[in-house]
Amino acid sequence: MPRSLKKGPFVDDHLQKKVDAQNEAGTHNVIRTWSRRSVVTPDFLGHTFAVHDGRKHTPVFVTESMVGHKLGEFAPTRTFKGHEKDDRKGRRR
């Protein structure tokens, strides 16, 4: 069930303050964050966030198509190494 429109998108306050400070200063430094739950808003455009994936911070450059999605969607938490290939040599008929 989507969030109510009257509430607006959720963004952690500390993250919004960092983005606003960089927008006022005109800089685009990398912002480290653990807030995967924050929604990407239009004022995030052009910024790079280092989103924590549970192990390391993954750099995420925000583009226009990302607006409305959550930061955590762009930093996968699981690495898929592929299924194990069948060993035909050890198989009996």
Curated annotation (Swiss-Prot):
InterPro entries: Ribosomal_uS19, Ribosomal_uS19_bac-type, Ribosomal_uS19_CS, Ribosomal_uS19_SF
Cited Pfam families: Ribosomal_S19
Residues covered by region (Disordered): 1-24, 73-93
GO molecular function (one): structural constituent of ribosome
GO cellular component terms given for this protein: cytoplasm; small ribosomal subunit
Biased composition (Basic and acidic residues): 9-21, 81-93
Residues spanning the signal sequence: none
Entry keywords, A to Z: Ribonucleoprotein, Ribosomal protein, RNA-binding, rRNA-binding
Cell division in keyword set: no
BP GO annotations: ribosomal small subunit assembly; translation
Record has Phosphoprotein as a keyword: no
Cited function: Protein S19 forms a complex with S13 that binds strongly to the 16S ribosomal RNA.
HAMAP family: Ribosomal_uS19 (MF_00531)
Family of the protein in this entry: Belongs to the universal ribosomal protein uS19 family.
Protein name per UniProt: Small ribosomal subunit protein uS19
Organism field: Kineococcus radiotolerans (strain ATCC BAA-149 / DSM 14245 / SRS30216)
